[in-house]
From Swiss-Prot:
Residues 322-391 form the U-box domain. It comes from Arabidopsis thaliana (Mouse-ear cress). GO terms for biological process: protein ubiquitination. Keywords: Transferase, Ubl conjugation pathway. InterPro entries: Ubox_domain, WD-SAM-U-box, Znf_RING/FYVE/PHD. This is U-box domain-containing protein 57. One of its GO terms (molecular function) is ubiquitin-protein transferase activity.
Amino acid sequence: MVKNSYVLFARLCVELPPLPSDESHGEITTVERQFLRNCQMELENLSLKTELPLVYVDESKYWRFIKTVRVLAEVFNNMKTTRTTRKSIIQVLMNPILPSERSTDAMNLFLSTIEKLADLQFSDEDFNQLFVSSRLDLQLENKYNDKVEVKLRKEAEDALARKIKEVVDLTERLLQVEALEHKHKAKLQLRTETETAVAIERDYMRWKAEIFESEFNNQLVLRRESEIALDKERKELEGIKNLLETCFTGQKNLKSQVITWKDKYDQGSSIRKEKEVALSTKKLELEIFKQLAGSYKQDADAMRQERDNALKTVQEIVDEQQPPPSFICPITQDVMKNPHMAADGFTYELEAIQKWINTGHRTSPMTNLKLSHFSFFPNRALRSAIEELGR
C-alpha cells in the first residue's frame, strides 16, 4: 500500500517543471526534493494498522487532500509556486497511474497516507471546481466499478488462486527437480570421491607391491649369497672335520704304537740290562782270569779264548736284535726314513704310499677299505724314535 504512494510521488516528481529555490542559492531545483522531504516524513510516521477502504472515501479525506496541496504551496512561498504550477500538481495527483479498475484504490490509498497533515484553508476557485469535477467523476467511476469490482475481484482471486497453485506446483516441481539434481550431484560427488579414493588406494597398493617386490628381490639376493657362503663354510667345515677325524685316528694309532713301542723298549731295556749284567759278570770273571793268568797261563789262554767267544756271542746277539714292527713300512717291509700317516690311521713310507696311490689304488694297504682322502701328514714322533734307534 505504501508502495503505491511511492509510485504517485515518483509520477509527480517527473511531471512537475523545475523551479528555483532559495536553499540552493538560486539554482534550479525540482519539486522532487521539497515534495519528498515533506510527504515522505508523513508516510514514515503514518500508522497502517487498520485496513484502508477500497472504494468509499469520506469528505474529510478529500479536505485533507486539499490541505496537502496547500502544504505543497506553502513550500514554495513568496509567490514562487504559481497558479499554473498548482493546477499541474492537482492534475498529476488526480491522474490515474494504474489500470482503470484499480485507479480508485490507488487514489484512496494515496489519500489515506496523508491524513495526518495539519488543517489549512485553500480558496482557489479554479481548484475547487476542478476538485468537484474530479469528485463527481470519481463517484461515477465508483458506481460503475461497484458492480464489476466483486466480479473482477473474484476473477482476480480465482486467477490468483490458480496462479498460486501453478506457482506452488511449479515450486514443488522445481524443488523436486532441485532435490533430484542435488541428489544426482551428491551421487556424482560421492562417485567421484569414491573413484578418487579407489585410485589413491590402487596407487598406494601398487606402490606397496613395488616396495614388497623390491624387498623380496633384495632378500632373495641376500638368501642366495647366504646359501653360497653357507655351502662354502659347510665344505670347509667338512674338510676340517675329516682332517680332525684323521688326526684323532692317527693320534689314537700313534698312541697305541707309542705304547707298543714303549713296551717293547722296556722289554729291550730289561734284556739290555740283563745283558749288561751278564757282560759285567763276564768282565768280572775275565778280571779274575787275568789275575790268575800268571799262575795259570794255560788256563788264561783258555779263558781268553772263552772270553773272545763270549764277546763274539754278545756281539752276535746285539747284531741280531730286530727293530719294533711300528718302525717297518707295511708296503716295503723296511725301516721307514720319512714316515707319514694316511687316512686309514696307519703310517707308511711317504714315497711308498704315494707310489701306491699313483698306481691306481684307492684303498688302504692294511684294511683294504676305500680311503676318505689322499692327504698325508708326517709322523714326527715315530721318525724321532727311528732316528734314536739308529744312533
